[in-house]
Amino acid sequence: SGLTLFDSFNHSLTTLSTGGFSTFNSSVSNLSQQSKLIINVFMYLAGISFILLLRTFKSRSLKEFYKSTEFKFYTSIVLMSSALFFAKTYSISTGIGESINDAFFTSLTLITTTGFTNLNYENWNINYRTYILGLMFLGGMAGSTAGGIKTIRVIALLKSVRNEIRKIFYPNAIFKIRMSKSILPEKMIESVQTFFILYVAIFVLGTFALSISINTFSDPISFEGILSAVASAMNNIGPGLSEVGPVENYYFLDSSSKIILSIL
């Protein structure tokens, strides 16, 4: 792949742990396409539940993947995001293969919260940047090394909201939430809802605290930069948007702002 044994070893550790640190100042943007392809594969695996991987290995059958609602949701988001990024990055000069590789890399580094820097998506339009901000919250599957909310909680919340809407039209009906053919108990749904309420509350408070700190002790930055910095800190990603984007860093922030982000 063109890397030394030392660099390969370090990148393998930070990929599987979804840590995202690199031995290069430019992160992985200057690595060969072969190296990025290898990192892509293991970022994708790092975002999958290790219990599911173990079951698949023991059964020696891919049926375990097909049975998992969470795996199908996770993979669908990766494919959809990669397709959107490919539509943005594709050009005749780079070639279709390189564009596909870069698109998958960008989606995986965000969804799995690895945080490697590959493309400068800061120059993309507001629609793409908003979508990227949303991906920063998602995270991989439960039981993986990825950070974020985790896809199983997102699925449970979406199905819970769907059931509440159904109850408006069918007030006497009883709706159950299924996950991979298993019915989720009500206590689990309540815990997921509580998690989201606390998560949103912490995000709002963190954004408010960081805004005050930056505007008091540092040079003011955009609201987009503040939002993405809080999202990045809460979900263990690293890069954000705007002033803390993929080719920037947090060096310019004052000590109090860094403490707030560290707590988050």
Identify the function of each model-found stretch.
Residues 1-264:
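Membrane-proximal intracellular helices of multi-pass ion channels
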